[in-house]
Swiss-Prot record:
Stated name of the protein: Lamina-associated polypeptide 2, isoform beta
Subunit and partners: Interacts with LMNB1, LMNB2, BANF1, AKAP8L, GMCL and chromosomes.
Organism expressing this protein natively: Rattus norvegicus (Rat)
PANTHER family: LAMINA-ASSOCIATED POLYPEPTIDE 2, ISOFORM BETA, LAMINA-ASSOCIATED POLYPEPTIDE THYMOPOIETIN
Post-translational modification Phosphothreonine, affected residues: T74, T159
Annotated segments matching region NAKAP95-binding N: 137-242
Length: 452
């Protein structure tokens, strides 16, 4: 007959189940704790070891009374002697370990005096899987260990301890304390996680409300005092909310000058108001010391009907709300714009000025396509070709001078007639002159007289 253990708490939960099933013991329905299987093992299996021992004692004679501690070292011979020896040795070791007083049971244990290794062992005993214990994480693990010890003390005080009658039940009770290590019970760790999650949530819940209130107050009042107050009060909150609040304050300061811009600050330069255009030119001369640019600017003022509408001046004041723009600064900005336009005109003198800055010329018609007749002018470059396109971009005075030159040109037959008249006049003058010996035509004249 096999011998069963007096202390089945040494076995694991699965081993207990297999032993009970092998010995035809009915298991309770559902998943139970280890203590339930230990009690079943003691009731059904460990109880089988006692009747043979009692019968043997009665047959021998008077019973030999001895304690359980003296009975454990004596090996019991039988069919399962070798198995019994191994299991008995394991049981003896377990009872010796559990009989020792544990450091966690001491109430006067100081957590701060423990070393890192001892602190790690204490946390492992409570079923916590800690990480590396360093100087920064030690305080956190000490607090965690204190919480676990407090919870363990509360659970011990709330649950009444059962009365134990025999030494076997003593060993079973001692072993049942360790049964939590091998069970799947993680109630302590779950409670601990909930406590850790609640602490940061309480701290974070208040910040969005205050930020929202501050933003509403900031949007309602655009004063500088309100902006500084929101920045100072939101300085305690770190990270993104502070940056978002400061961005809102800067946007608010940029929006404020829109209400301050009045039509009286805009400069209107046209034919009706001339007194304001001349001081602008004077300030430009004084600030830039460039008479050429100033002359160009005044010329542009004369030709333009309306320069820089009101919206442009309001945009300038919106971009720089810190100080109001003076007439000199506005003049300098308009000067820069005009100078850029003049430079473009100097680079491209024959380009037409368009609002978009893109100019296009008309395309010459394609001859020979769509039934159009071919002309000789299409294959020969003439002066009229250049005069068709270039005069469009030439100033008005140059066009007038070219027209006058074309009107003075004289036809060829008139030129030949004038040349003949001048030649005949010269011949008559020559004939009217006195005869002279040095005349080269004297011999010719004498021959004509003789022939007559």
């Amino acid at each position: 007959m096999p011998e069963f253990l007096e202390d089945p708490s040494v076995l694991t939960k699965d081993k207990l189940k297999s032993e009970l099933v092998a010995n035809n013991v009915t298991l309770p329905a559902g998943e139970q704790r280890k203590d339930v299987y230990v009690q079943l093992y003691l009731q059904h299996l460990t109880a089988r070891n006692r009747p043979p021992l009692a019968a043997g004692a009665n047959s021998k004679g008077p019973p030999d009374f001895s304690s359980d501690e003296e009975r454990e070292p004596t090996p019991v011979l039988g069919s399962g002697a070798s198995v019994g020896r191994g299991r008995g040795a394991v049981g003896r070791k377990a009872t010796k370990k559990t009989d020792k007083p544990r450091p966690e049971d001491k109430d006067d244990l100081d957590v701060t005096e423990l070393s890192n290794e001892e602190l790690l062992e204490q946390l492992v005993r409570y079923g916590v899987n800690p990480g590396p214990i360093v100087g920064t994480t030690r305080k956190l693990y000490e607090k965690k260990l204190l919480k676990l010890r407090e919870q363990g003390a509360e659970s011990r005080s709330s649950t009444p301890l059962p009365t134990v009658s025999s030494s076997a039940e003593n060993t079973r009770q001692n072993g049942s304390n360790d049964s939590d290590r091998y069970s799947d019970n993680d109630e302590d760790s779950k409670i601990e996680l909930k406590l850790e999650k609640r602490e940061p949530l309480k701290g974070r819940a208040k910040t969005p409300v205050t930020l929202k209130q501050r933003r509403i107050e900031h949007n309602q009042s655009y004063s500088e005092a309100g902006v500084t107050e929101t920045e100072w009060t939101s300085g305690s909150s770190k990270g993104g909310p502070l940056q978002a609040l400061t961005r809102e304050s800067t946007r608010g300061s940029r929006r404020t000058p829109r209400r301050r811009v009045e039509p009286s600050q805009h400069f209107r330069v046209d034919g009706a108001v001339i007194s304001e255009s001349t001081p602008i030119a004077e300030t430009i001369k004084a600030s830039s010391n460039d008479s050429l640019v100033a002359n160009r600017l005044t010329g542009n003022f004369k030709h333009a009907s309306s320069i820089l509408p009101i919206t442009e001046f309001s945009d300038i004041t919106r971009r720089t709300p810190k100080k109001p723009l003076t007439r000199a600064e506005v003049g300098e900005k308009t000067e820069e714009r005009r100078v850029e336009r003049d430079i473009l005109k100097e680079m491209f003198p024959y380009e037409a000025s368009t609002p978009t800055g893109i100019s296009a010329s008309c395309r010459r018609p394609i001859k020979g396509a769509a039934g159009r007749p071919l002309e000789l002018s299409d294959f020969r470059m003439e002066e009229s070709f250049s005069s068709k396109y270039v005069p469009k971009y030439v100033p008005l005075a140059d066009v007038k001078s070219e027209k006058t030159k074309k009107g003075r040109s004289v036809p060829m037959w008139i030129k030949m007639l004038l040349f003949a008249l001048v030649a005949g006049f010269l011949f008559l003058v020559y004939q009217a002159m006195e005869t002279n010996q040095g005349n080269p035509f004297t011999n010719f004249l004498q021959d004509t007289k003789i022939s007559n």
